[in-house]
């Protein structure tokens, strides 16, 4: 039984798992995309399953994306937007 678990874990690590996450999509400088024209289209173009408008305190209305790939940057509250 333990061998089966170890083999399954090894296969999972070898195959690799593409993880996804939800978040506010941003430009490379941690500046959010605002909800005009459409968040759903923007999010889907970047590999998400869907998108909608959300609100961030001190930032305003921004695009919230569901199931974004790891390579797409999302909003990080610890960094400010700079252009």
From Swiss-Prot:
GO BP, one annotated term: defense response
Annotated S-S bridges: 31-81, 35-53, 39-63, 43-65
Record InterPro entries: LCN-type_CS_alpha_beta_dom (IPR044062), Scorpion_toxin-like (IPR003614), Scorpion_toxin-like_sf (IPR036574), Scorpion_toxinL/defensin (IPR002061)
Pfam families linked to this entry: Toxin_3
Alphabetical list of CDD domains matching this protein: neurotoxins_LC_scorpion
Tissue specificity note: Expressed by the venom gland.
Gene Ontology MF term list: sodium channel inhibitor activity; toxin activity
Leader peptide range in chain numbering: 1-19
Protein localization: Secreted
Function: Alpha toxins bind voltage-independently at site-3 of sodium channels (Nav) and inhibit the inactivation of the activated channels, thereby blocking neuronal transmission.
Protein name, entry field: Toxin Aam1
The organism of origin for this protein: Androctonus amoreuxi
